[in-house]
């Protein structure tokens, strides 16, 4: 059955939905977070289409309000300005959550950041073979470490380390350089970029952090470094409607906090980049300009990141627009632009409407600094009249509870979607150069009305039911909107058993959907798959030619790659390079490789297993041997492996995985060789698979420490090919 998803929970905050680029939909539900992951086509094959749409999703629910004493130390009473009784005594419910851009977590997935009401910001990701969601970092410690040398008073240090709001920036990617070497791969900083996170603390400091995952598993899973700090202590622009000298105004301004923020686009220069960060400081809107310089350290940096970045930030609100002081900004905030547009638009929620601030890109790109004109448009929320006789349309004054920017699949232009706590929804498309932006209906308006009318009919409310929006999220042309429905003419009594959150799924064009379709290989023809595979083979075979200063790869991986090329490839240049690598291996080890060298020009040949005297002799470590009987392993296929005595590797592993995932096991062919290193996967627990196409790979974390050269080689190769060689899908354990 196609339709909205109904979940037995109630959201604990506005903007309660966040959708990662990997397809995982996170929902803030009090002291829990619920994550919905779409099932792939094979998993949905045996399900009845008449069942509820929720059956098309995997559902995981985990607690986020349980902390150890090391994670959340005991806080003793402080003075009135530093002690937050509500935060310390709260139930630590979720007040905000957001996925990071892809590339930060293990297997280049997304990390989930969760802010709880005790003012702690945590990072979560699935850990272990069972994929249990676990807290892997608390970012308040990075603030405490930074401010510890600056602030001496314990109470002020507590305020500096409490986090009130946060926002992920879009990935800051290094411009891709033109590579002239064959089979080269862009660095991770160009594929995934740097991951920056802005946080606002209890002392109204805006801190920009760089979050990164160390290359090895030693120490903390994630590290956070402070790049810049901006302090907003001036409160004169807040609450302009109040008498500045009144006691009430003074009390209000003493409690001002930064509660929402949003990153704008990056503008790239030759060796630097600049961007904007908009924040709501009380009722005022502030704009921070960030200049980032990328430093390339020498290669002898050990476990440190290959590239370092430094940042300088400053408040440019007066330069950005001088006439913002008369508005009561409440948030949320969002930016709209395209790569080829001449303008950028900042959308900011106000007390009873929306402000659109349109500015030229040219001053920020260094093209024409004198052409920076900023235009302002104020939008008020009016209900569309049902008939021509209505002269006074209903105006909505509720706060904006959800706002996102999604790319329209038809026009390929960004569209701002918003919803209020009173059920008003609107869509504002971005139009480069237009002075006025129109308001349109959202594509899921009919679905929302159907949910509300069904609730109204079931309870005989006479058309007085109201729908409240709690959050919106978008992913790959899909939009999810979370709503609840309530009686509009009475006090509502609701028990925990009656809590319901309805998630409406829609495309940007307005068609109804059950969710994301599973990712598939764009071209599954043998020729396309061979080309994808040859790109990885060529990278390994040309590894030392492209950079002689790098540590060489493992001899066993080089030999396996050369054999795989002989068996599979028809590329003469690649076969010639395999011949060159085999000659180098024979020279280094002194092993007789004439059999392999003679087959570099043959087609669809096999390579016999090595006898025991060669396996035990000099250079024998580069040949594979059976872990059961120590016999040699033949090369007859790039997908299967069998030793001289008949042991076939991977059958138990494939059967176990099929049993765990409740799918039928296909006996032929069985993927038993790593799709990147070409090594035979003999241990059932030493592999990982592509979550899209199912190709099997060796897990670099499962390699024994004694095999240091193989471990280094696998980590080096999987750093370069951190997604599936064939379909660019993400790995999973």
What are these regions (language model features)?
Residues 1-5, 23-87, 120-146, 154, 190-195, 199-361, ...:
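Beta-propeller domains
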Residues 31, 39, 103, 118, ...:
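Residue-level signature of beta-propeller blades and closely related beta-rich strand-turn architectures
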Residues 25-26, 112-113, 198, 277-278, ...:
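Structural core positions within WD40/WD-like beta-propeller blades
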Residues 21, 29-31, 108, 115-118, ...:
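Short loop/turn segments that connect beta-strands within the blades of beta-propeller domains
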Residues 34-38, 97, 121-126, 166, ...:
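WD40-repeat beta-propellers
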Residues 1-26, 31-45, 52, 79-82, ...:
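C-terminal scaffolding/assembly regions of large eukaryotic complex subunits
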């Amino acid at each position: 059955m196609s339709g909205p998803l109904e979940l037995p929970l109630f959201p604990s905050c506005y903007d309660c939905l966040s959708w990662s680029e990997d397809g995982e939909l996170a929902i803030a539900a009090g002291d829990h977070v619920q994550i919905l992951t779409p099932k792939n086509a094979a998993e949905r094959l045996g399900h009845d289409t008449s069942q509820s749409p929720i059956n098309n999703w995997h559902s995981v629910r985990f607690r986020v309000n349980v902390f150890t004493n090391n994670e959340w130390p005991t806080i003793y009473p402080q003075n009135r300005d530093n002690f937050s009784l509500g935060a310390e005594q709260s139930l630590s419910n979720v007040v905000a959550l957001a996925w990071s851009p892809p590339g930060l977590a293990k297997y280049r997935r997304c990390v989930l950041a969760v802010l709880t009401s005790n003012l702690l910001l945590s990072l979560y990701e699935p850990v272990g073979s069972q994929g249990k969601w676990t807290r892997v970092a608390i970012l308040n410690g990075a603030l405490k470490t930074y401010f510890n040398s600056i602030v001496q008073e314990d109470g002020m240090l507590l305020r500096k380390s409490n986090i009130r709001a946060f926002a992920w920036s879009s990935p800051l990617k290094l411009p891709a350089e033109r590579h002239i070497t064959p089979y080269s791969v862009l660095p991770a900083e160009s594929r995934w970029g740097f991951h920056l996170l802005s946080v606002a603390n209890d002392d109204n400091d805006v801190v920009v952090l760089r979050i990164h995952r160390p290359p090895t598993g030693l120490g903390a899973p994630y590290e956070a470094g402070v790049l810049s700090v901006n302090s907003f202590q001036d409160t004169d622009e807040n609450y302009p409607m109040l008498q500045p000298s009144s006691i009430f105004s003074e009390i209000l301004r003493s409690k001002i906090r930064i509660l929402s923020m949003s990153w704008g686009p990056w503008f790239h220069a030759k060796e630097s980049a600049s961007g904007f960060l908009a924040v709501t400081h009380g009722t005022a809107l502030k704009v921070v300009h960030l200049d980032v310089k990328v430093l390339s350290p020498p290669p002898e940096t050990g476990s440190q990141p290959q590239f370092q970045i430094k940042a300088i930030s400053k408040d440019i609100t007066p330069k950005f627009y001088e006439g913002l002081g008369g508005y009561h900004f409440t948030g949320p905030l969002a930016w709209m632009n395209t790569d080829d547009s001449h303008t950028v638009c900042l959308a900011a929620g106000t007390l009873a409407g929306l402000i659109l601030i349109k500015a030229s890109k040219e001053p920020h790109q260094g093209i024409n600094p004198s052409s920076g004109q900023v235009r302002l448009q104020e939008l008020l929320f009016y209900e569309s009249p049902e008939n021509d006789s209505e002269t006074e349309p209903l105006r909505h004054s509720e706060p904006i509870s959800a706002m996102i920017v999604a790319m329209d699949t038809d026009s390929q232009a960004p569209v701002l979607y918003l919803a209020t706590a009173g059920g008003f929804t609107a869509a504002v498309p971005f139009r480069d150069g237009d002075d006025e932006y129109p308001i349109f209906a959202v594509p899921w308006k009919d679905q929302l009305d159907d949910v509300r009318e069904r609730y109204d009919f079931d309870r005989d409310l006479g058309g007085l039911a109201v729908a409240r929006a709690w959050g919106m999220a978008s992913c790959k042309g899909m939009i999810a909107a979370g709503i609840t429905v309530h009686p509009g003419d009475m006090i509502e009594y609701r028990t925990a058993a009656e809590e319901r959150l309805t998630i409406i799924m829609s495309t940007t064009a307005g068609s109804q959907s059950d969710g994301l379709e599973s990712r598939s290989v764009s071209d599954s023809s043998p020729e396309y798959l061979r080309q994808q595979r040859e790109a990885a083979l060529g990278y390994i075979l040309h590894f030392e030619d492209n950079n002689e200063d790098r540590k060489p790869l493992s001899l066993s991986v080089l030999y396996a790659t050369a054999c795989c090329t002989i068996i599979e490839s028809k590329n003469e240049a690649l076969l010639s390079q395999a011949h060159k690598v085999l000659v180098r291996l024979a020279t280094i080890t002194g092993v007789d490789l004439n059999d392999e060298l003679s087959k570099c020009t043959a087609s669809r040949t096999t390579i016999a297993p090595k006898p025991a005297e060669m396996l035990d002799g000099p250079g024998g470590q580069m040949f594979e041997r059976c872990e059961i009987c120590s016999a040699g392993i033949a090369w007859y296929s790039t997908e299967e492996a069998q030793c001289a005595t008949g042991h076939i590797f991977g059958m138990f592993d494939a059967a176990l995985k099929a049993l765990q995932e409740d799918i039928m096991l296909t006996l032929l062919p069985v993927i038993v060789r790593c799709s990147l290193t070409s090594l035979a996967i003999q241990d059932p627990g030493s592999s990982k698979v592509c979550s899209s196409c199912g190709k099997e790979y060796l897990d670099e974390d499962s390699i024994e420490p004694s095999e240091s050269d193989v471990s280094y080689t696998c980590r080096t190769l999987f750093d370069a090919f951190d997604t599936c060689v064939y379909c660019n899908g993400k790995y999973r354990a």
